[in-house]
Amino acid sequence: MCICVNCDLLVFCSLYQTIEILHKESLSFELDQIVEFEPRKSNIIVNINSSENSIKHEWDVISCESFVLNLSKYNVS
C-alpha cells in the first residue's frame, strides 16, 4: 500500500499527483490551487499484474524522507 495516503503533505506533493495520474484516478484536490514540492528520497514499487486480456500497473510509494504522518488525512467514503 502507498504510504502517501497517511502523509500530511499529500496535497502538496508532486510525486503523489503523478501517481494519481498514473492510476487514472481523479485527484481529490485542484491542481491549480497547490504549491508543489518534490519529496526527498522516495522509493516506489511498481507491481505489474497481467491476465489474458489486460495488464494492470500499481504504483506504491514505500518510503519517503519527506513523509509526515497524519492518520486522518485520507478519508475513504
Swiss-Prot record:
Its main location: plastid. It is found in: Plastid, Cyanelle. InterPro entries: Uncharacterised_Ycf34. Keywords: Cyanelle, Plastid. It comes from the Eukaryota. Pfam families: Ycf34. GO terms for cellular component: cyanelle. The keyword Plastid applies. This is Uncharacterized protein ycf34. It comes from Cyanophora paradoxa. The lineage of its organism: Eukaryota, Glaucocystophyceae, Cyanophoraceae, Cyanophora. The gene is ycf34.
